[in-house]
């Protein structure tokens, strides 16, 4: 938590973009720089990490990673450590991760700490938010929108997916658009990355 306030730190969200779309750690002004790899899945992480612009942002910095429960951080930090040993173009001040992931962070900081929005979960709960934070505040923090009407909305309900055959990640559909998304619009739903041609 303390490292997030340090300017020589870079924090990387190693989750998929559809997860970061509804919530993420937001370091304080003057603190750590936030990097989002904008991945559809974790198989895209090595390519992002090997990009020259990414290496430049990590060089000489403390690198903190986080994910939902800590497992993806373990893999991501091992990959970065391996890269450091193999080449001189990405030498950091150290690699760290949020132990126990966002789940534990939100239990440690029930008011949210530096967390904004919701934590996407892969179980029946669907999402998790800071226990002591008002629902209206959480809604304003997310910044995500319905993929149909673009109205602010932050819940993945109904298990809708991007219609792009190479993508198929979950998309957000608000209550008012759900019926159309299940019917006539089903083959036109796009995630934010596909909308931006990323």
Protein language model features and the residues they cover:
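Rhodanese-like catalytic fold shared by cysteine-dependent sulfurtransferases
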Residues: 3-9, 16-64, 71-198
């Amino acid at each position: 938590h303390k490292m997030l306030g340090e300017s020589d730190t870079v924090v990387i969200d190693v989750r998929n973009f559809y997860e970061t779309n509804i919530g993420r750690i937001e370091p304080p002004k003057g603190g750590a720089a936030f990097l989002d790899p904008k991945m559809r899945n974790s198989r895209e992480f090595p390519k992002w990490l090997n990009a020259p612009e990414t290496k430049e942002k990590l060089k000489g910095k403390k690198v903190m990673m986080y994910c939902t429960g800590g497992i993806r951080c373990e893999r991501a930090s091992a990959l970065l450590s391996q890269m450091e040993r193999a080449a001189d173009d990405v030498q950091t001040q150290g690699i760290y991760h949020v132990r126990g992931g966002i789940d534990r962070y939100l239990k440690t900081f029930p008011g949210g700490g530096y967390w904004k929005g919701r934590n996407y979960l892969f179980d029946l709960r669907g999402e998790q938010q800071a226990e002591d934070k008002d629902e209206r505040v959480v809604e304003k923090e997310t910044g995500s929108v319905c993929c149909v009407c673009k109205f602010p909305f932050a819940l993945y309900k109904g298990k809708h997916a991007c219609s792009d055959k190479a993508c198929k990640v979950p998309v957000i559909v608000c209550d008012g658009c759900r019926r159309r998304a299940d019917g006539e619009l089903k083959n036109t739903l796009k995630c934010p990355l596909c909308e931006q041609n990323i």
